[in-house]
Structures are given as C-alpha cells and as structure tokens.
Amino acid sequence: MHPKIANLCLEKKCHFASTSYISPEIKKFDKDAKSMGLIFINEVGLDPGIDHFFSHLLVKDLDKQNLENISVSYQSYCGGVPATPNDFKYKFSWSPVGVIKALNSSSKFIKDFKESIVVPYKHISNYDINNEIFEAYPNRNSLPYIEEYMFPKNWKIEEFVRGTLRLKGWKNAWEEIFNTLEKKPENLDEKIKNKSDELWNLYQYKEDEEDRVILWVKL
C-alpha cells in the first residue's frame, strides 16, 4: 500500500510521511522526491520513530565520556497493549495476519557478544520495567541499527536488541497460535487467515477505546 501512496504523492507533487519501516520499494522514490523538492519520510511513529531519537541521544551522551575498552548493552523495547487487560492480553488496531506472521519471521540481534537468530515466538522472556513485569521478544533485524545509531567502532557490543513488549500472561494466552506455527501445516497461510478473521472479530479495538503504549530504551 505505501508504495502506491508514495507514487501518488509524486504524481500530485505532495509530501509523504509514514510511521512504517523503510522498505526497498519506498527507497526507490528517494531520488525522484529529492529532485522535485518533496519530503518523503518514514519511521516517524513511536517505534520506529521516537525510539530512534532516544537511541541517538543515549549514544551521543555515552560517547562524550570518552571511555576506553568499554562493553555496552543496548535494549529498545516497545509495545501497545489494552489499557484494561483482557483474557487474550492483547487487542488489534491492524490486521492480525501481520502480527502473527511477524511472530514467525526470524529476528536477528546480539547477545553475549554473539549474533543470534531466533523465531520470536520461541524466544519470549520476562522483562522488568520499573517493577512491572512484561513479556518481551526480539523483533526483526536489529543489527543495521548499530550503524544507524552511530555506535563507535571501539565499543564492544555485549547486547544489542530491538524488541516488542506484551502484557504478562500473553504467552499463555497465545499458546494455541504458537502451537499452530510450530506444527507448520501445509495450509498454514489459510489457518493464519482464518484465525486472523476470528481474532479481529473478538479483539479489535472499539472506536475511541483507550490503549496503552510502553517504550523503554536503555544503554
């Protein structure tokens, strides 16, 4: 959808802004947009977006201290959850298909100075934020952001992960979905689509219903 909208913006000579990650398709519009004096900007939401801003501030602040031979641990976690927890520990503001498929797509990060690749739903752990326990898992490929956030080359990176937060109990509430992903049936896409329709009917946000967002960036 975003490439179609971006192309329409070029045709109409309009600026383009999106909260979504920069995709290869969107990158192709960069040259034309600049030549036309248009602003095409992505990743300007909470995550991705505000988390980038906090990350750059933390890196700059630590770098100014001119410390030598340091090991650093970077964590950035964000999540949107119901303001009033429900039995499913989650509600949907967009297609459940995308949420489920993201859980089944490999995530890449650094742990104990080593690169790790995991499937998110198999790597859920408790995460404490100001004495509130959430459940967390790594999201997408974190590694390009080491350069994006301009980590100095002399820093030894013990941990670098960007991930997602969920309410405590979310893992158990989603056990049926995880079991389906684990079994890898031939008609997995069909099962995901059917489950998505069911979840959308049961757990979509109502109009004007409040949610809660949590963002935690640590270095």
Enumerate the language-model features and the residues they cover.
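Short, charged/polar micro-motifs that form catalytic or ligand-binding hotspots
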Residues: 19, 45, 135
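Rossmann-fold NAD(P)-binding glycine/threonine-rich loop
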Residues: 3-12, 19-42
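An acidic- and aromatic-residue-enriched active-site/binding cleft used to recognize and process polar
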Residues: 1, 21-22, 77-81
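Beta-sheet entry/capping signal
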Residues: 14-15, 73
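C-terminal catalytic/substrate-binding lobe primarily of soluble NAD(P)-dependent oxidoreductases
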Residues: 61-219
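A structural signal for well-ordered alpha-helical segments within the folded catalytic domains
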Residues: 3, 49, 53, 139-143
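Adenosine-phosphate binding glycine-rich loop
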Residues: 32-82
